[in-house]
Amino acid sequence: MICGLDEAGCGPLAGPVTAGAAVLPPDFPVGLLRDSKQLSEKKRLLLYDLICERAAAQATAFIWPEEIDRINIRQAALKAMAEAFDRVRKQLPDVAEWRCLADGNQVPPVAVPCTAVVKGDRLIPEIMAASILAKTERDRYMLEADKLYPEYG
């Protein structure tokens, strides 16, 4: 079973780093997917809903600023990917063989074979789906945070 992994929030100065993990079924319309950064918000939200409805499994994970400050942003992103993968794995407990494909040039600390794919969010449908999950969940969190703390923009 292939699980795509990606993160959102490594560049911004505020908020959590968020990772997405996605396992797509064979009949998923992968031709609709793109890197989340290449999609309009409207299209990204539609694809987010489609992924949530049709993925074989999907999950997100947040690592919060306090931990980011303690372990650094790169390690936090990898930890978030590992946590998101663990959540996906629990959704499919009968799967014996796993393989992760992670966007970027490093792999998260998971106990299954994992390959780093540079620009994977533009190449691999499972990573594209994970990218959409991560960006959408992080954006939703940041919009809620803005309502609570509007002075921070």
Annotated model-derived regions:
Residues 1-153:
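RNase H-like, Mg2+-dependent phosphodiesterase core
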